Amino acid sequence: MNEIIVGEYKIHSLLKSFADKDEERNVYIVLNKSNEKFICKEIIYTQNSNIDNEKRKSEYINLKKFSDTIKYPHLNISKYIEHFIILENQQEKEKIKKQYIITEFYDGGDLSSLKITNKKCFSIKNGDIIYLFLKMLIIFKEFQTVIIHRDIKPDGSIVNDYYLCDLGSSTQVKTINSSTLIGTNQYIAPDVIKRGGYTGTIDIYGLGKTLLLLLNRVQQNQYNKINKILFEMMCSNESTERPTVDQLIEFMVCQYDNISFTEFDDFTHPLSKDCIEYFKNNKLNILKKDVKPIQIKIKIKEKEYRAYGAIQALLRNFYYIDNVISIEDNNNNNNNNNNNNNNNNNNNNNNNNNNNNNNNNNSDGPIEVAEFEWNENTDRLASELLLGHFKTETGGKNYEIANSHIEFVLKSEVLKSLSYHDEIVIDRQATPIYDNFINSDDSQAQIPPTSTKCIHIFSNHKYNFQKFIRDLPYGELTGDVQLKAIFHLILVIFEIAENGPDFMYNALLEKNMGTLFIIPPSSETTPRPPTPTATTTPTPTATTPTTTTATTTKLSQHNFKFLFPFRSYAFSHSSNTKLHIFLNIFGDHTKDGLIVDILKLAKELDKTKLPTVDIILQLIKMIQKEKCKLLETYSNSGLDFYFNNFETLIFNYELKESLTKLIDKNKIIHCVDSLNQILTTRYFYFVENHYKCYAIEPYKSLELISSFNENKNIYIRKLLHYSSFPSMKRFKYIQTYYDKVNNSHYFVFEIPKKLLNTTKKMELTKQSSSTTTKIDRMKIFKNLIVQHLNNIQELKTHLKSIYEYSFNLVISLEDDNKFELYYSNSVSPFSSDGFIRSFYDIGKWVFGNLNNQEEEGDQLVKMKSYFSFLRILSELSWFCNILGSGNVHNSIVYNELNIYYYLKMLLPLLNDIKINVFHYQIQNDIFAKIIIGNTQYNIINLIEPNHIDDPFSMVQYHLYIMELEKIETSDKFTCLRKQFNQRPQKQSKIFEIPNPNNSIDEILIEPTLIVQDINTSFQFFKVNGIIKTIEDFNQEKDYSNIIILRSFLYFLQYLFKNPSKTTLLVLFDIRKIDFDNINSSNDIDNESIPQYLCFDFLYFIKQMYGIDIYFQFEDFLEIISTRPSIVSNIIQSNKKKILNDIICMDIIENDISMKDVFYLLSVDIIKTISPTVNLVIYDKRYYIQKEVGSISKIREWKKFGIISSHPDAVVFLKYGKKDLKSAMLDNGKVNDENYYGIAVEDYMKSNELNILYYLLSKQEEPDFTNIERYYLENDKIYAMFPYVNGSCNLSEIDNLNEMDLLNILYQLCFQLHQLENLGIFHRDVKPENIISLRYGNGGIVVFIVDFGISQYKGKHLENYYSRDGTFGYQAPEIYREELRGDGDIKTQKYKMDVFSLGCTMAFLIKKFNITSTYLNDFIDNMTQPHVCKSFKK
């Protein structure tokens, strides 16, 4: 814009705009002379504005006051820069006419702009919400006695550390304005609507609504349910039931003290701790004596406790509660804190007496503790508890799983000494539970217990190590304590990884209830948890840290225990947490260098994807080397306990593993997968034993491999037989070792000893193509290919078919600097594509990623073509011969001679390779073959064009270009093969097109033959040249290249002329479409080699709009032929390019079939009336243009790649786009056909457009408010209304008398009555939505317009009382339930329009000073607050 708005500031862009009868507000981004960005709020007051001058001044006064960073450094307020005011002269005093307020600019946007990002993460997390909450509490505390903000909403908080902005609605506390209606509809507290006066709790309401909105937006699998309950309490309809700022601060400080060291992510924001410290340092968390703290209760076995954290996991009925603190103990603690602060000079006995007195006054009653007794002699109720809660049926599967996990820990000799200590576990038993056991303090609901049973595990969090070190001074945490904690975790994780179930190991890594505890030595009298008597010792809190155990003995003499992550279900996925992350519990605050070395080695080994047991063994070996040094440095610290356990662990493990104990982890080689590069889960151990060398290949859960069990003996015999081949360098199979405990197979092969000495040279991950020249790499490639072909020939003489089994290639650098091939058979049988991939593997190993090669030229192009050919042939072979298992109408036939021929044909530099053993056969059988239908074709070449794979499409496909030769006739074809994502079908349909339609100047070429089924489609063309796709011309990423547009229009022309015989995939001769560029080119190749554009209409529409029209093409064709559609949207959105292109205009204007359907609208905007309404000129006539909708689902698809409103979209949000298909298969969602795209009939939704055409069909005589036409452009739907000069809305009219008002009232009542008869209620009647026109005789006519939020009768009930609309004209029952009638809800909604009409008339009466008693009484009756007393229309 660059328009100077005020002072030195230029407008950069408009952010928001708002206007009502009193004022107009515009928010701009502006630039100063230095091009720095600022926010400018422009406020323009109307001539009849009711806002007094003091209120106008408060716009900048409050902001300026609280922007003082010296006085208020802790407030995150949008900082005031300066302001400008423009005055209007009046007789009595000067009023502000305009004002401009300049504030700082924050580029994070406001909270309302937060959207879902990539994969399963969101742009804001739970920790961010809590940090925002804490920052708002700091601001509210400062505002508590000064001002009320009155407009807390997402639009008012900036995302960039979070700043509160827009203090325009704020007011002084306890002033005359305390009952003024100001704020944003969705966030206005009910007490504002009642106009009975209010305090700062209305800001609590608005903040609660904002936090709930954010919580719902970021809600993930696990969240703290307590936060949701707290936010709902803040949104209570009664102001007296909402917590105060002081209560909220006290609650959040207690919550921080109790859960910040647990797995809750509430306080993960790095600045949250600073907010808590601010509260504590200023003693803001200490309540006054008469203020009761917030209590959110949890009911356990009929007893109530105050809860600070509750996580509800969404998997398999699993629940647990963290850190339950008994209400009585908490009251004692609060009273102790209060009394201690008020009476610092009293002695301990006086404090105890005060505590007891306060306890009698404030406690809700004693809590029985008998059910928590550990034994008959000792009463031990922990004041701090962790409750592991497993909801399951006693005797059921889940119950047995959870119980078996506990028994596993108790029976393990190793774990018995490492975990489950008396001081940790208080109780474990199955008891009745309540389905909904979390209630707020004021909840009176009585929920009967169910018959379901559960397992409770009560643990004492007083000894939690994370909490312990959090409250401990940094200097007291010594190196030996840190080492003992790390050693303890190493022993625990090894025992679970070696002998425990996988899902327990995964849960342990993810820290689900897995907790490390520090216990005082047994020689010391252990501090007991308090018993609820008159002499109870207060529970440690933020003001009394838990450090009593550290003061009585040296910290190094404490012991560690572990509570395992017991689960009532089996993990179905592997943990994403790495071992080095699990062990890193101290961050950067380590006190011993060995810990740094442990974490560094663990991180390196994590990358190798070695089994956890093997990683830990290496860690222990490194630790053992430092044994003497550590025992000398940290004497009498208990480290010898861990070293003794390490030695026992290593001895037992090596004794158990007869062969695998010999494994040297420094000698490991990974296997290669052709398409997925290096496989980190497939590898060999290379070991040495008795002067022989072995390769040990581990496999987990081998029974999952298809056909292995039933063919196991045959397969192993063949492996043994292969090892006798004299010339092939193969791994000699020795035996298979089975580990029953871990359900793992170890395949042992004997290898040449020299391989053991060159293992590091063999590692494929370290092979670099930059170490050799281009010629050297080609020489290496030749050598390896010769070896491989000769080996294949020998293998073929011993085995009927080499294609039934796949094998792994190992490439070794020998002593003479030559590379040699070694082989080992894969344990995955029946992989026919393995043979082809072996050639691809060699090329990939030698040349690396060809796409990243720096050198260019013909040789690189040919290498790329060859390897691409092998990869495509491998994929086709796998699908046809394996997945299909013979149930397909197409199949691949090939042998090693074919691969050799393609090698020489596509890589001419290898023509000097001589392989005499089969050289004489080459002329007779040189091509691989494909059978399509019942016809055989030679495969001349295979090409993968530039195409985008889309995993969401139901008919998404891989496109391959096949150059084929029909064996019977030697005819050559270009075949385009599409691979759908469906299971193979043997039945096929063959379509022959004897007379292809080339009537469009021979530009469009149809296929001559189509063979297809539900799974694959082969389309044959008699052309020879280069095939390109629309992606080759999609440089702007919007498919608006002129070649694409011309092809699109040509195809539409072909489509309308031949709707009955249309094929959806055709070729266009690029030389004829883009003849201007071709003719002007000096490139001889472009003129001599034909080029064709593959235009697939299915693919084009899918890429543009996400719509699959494959199964609904007839419906789609009818839509685009009869009315505006996405096709006309494409044309209209590209009208400038089309109008300037002779070919495009010739197609549209000179073809009747096109001209009647598609036309270009040149609409020029004359004036912008509102963000969605413009005065325009079209075809020399004036119109009102209004945006009445958008292709909403298409917009959503373009942004997210899927329709998130679909009920299964949670799969996308959870797993991300990459893993959606596999996730859907796991969740059984694959059968929902509508999931993959947008239904044709649903892509364009506009409720207003439907209503407008419905009204037009019911009216006998059209008027100037009737829609004349609509069109689509840039994915938006625009309606066009005729414009009549002299018309205006009622807010703009300047002269009305009493008779005019009566006439207007009559007309509007009649129109609302008509709407009611048609089943429509308007929902936004106001002066701005009523158009008036005065005739020459003085008469006036009015019409209701703008049906943007109108509703049909019978729609969802929640829409009836939606807060959409204009505040000040909405019926009060929208905001207050008690004002709603008891009758039929479907009739009450029309009374809302009556109320809005009454408010509109009241506005006009006041504006024109109408004193008619009759009219005023009539309007008063229309605006009665109770629905039963309002007039009917």
Swiss-Prot record:
Transmembrane stretches, start-end: none
EC annotation from Swiss-Prot or TrEMBL: 2.7.11.1
Catalytic activity: L-seryl-[protein] + ATP = O-phospho-L-seryl-[protein] + ADP + H(+); L-threonyl-[protein] + ATP = O-phospho-L-threonyl-[protein] + ADP + H(+)
UniProt cross-references to InterPro entries, sorted A to Z: Kinase-like_dom_sf (IPR011009), Prot_kinase_dom (IPR000719)
Pfam families: Pkinase (PF00069)
Residue positions of the active site: D151 (proton acceptor)
Biased composition (Low complexity): 332-362, 533-550
Example GO molecular function: protein serine kinase activity
Residues the entry annotates as binding ATP: M1, N2, E3, I4, K41
SUPFAM superfamilies in alphabetical order: Protein kinase-like (PK-like)
Keywords (A to Z) from UniProt: ATP-binding, Kinase, Nucleotide-binding, Repeat, Serine/threonine-protein kinase, Transferase
Chain segments carrying region Disordered: 332-366, 521-550
Domain Protein kinase: 1-272, 1177-1433
Superkingdom of the organism of origin: Eukaryota
Family, as annotated: Belongs to the protein kinase superfamily. Ser/Thr protein kinase family.
Domain comment in the entry: The protein kinase domain 2 is predicted to be catalytically inactive.
Descriptive protein name: Probable serine/threonine-protein kinase DDB_G0277989
Native source organism of the sequence: Dictyostelium discoideum (Social amoeba)
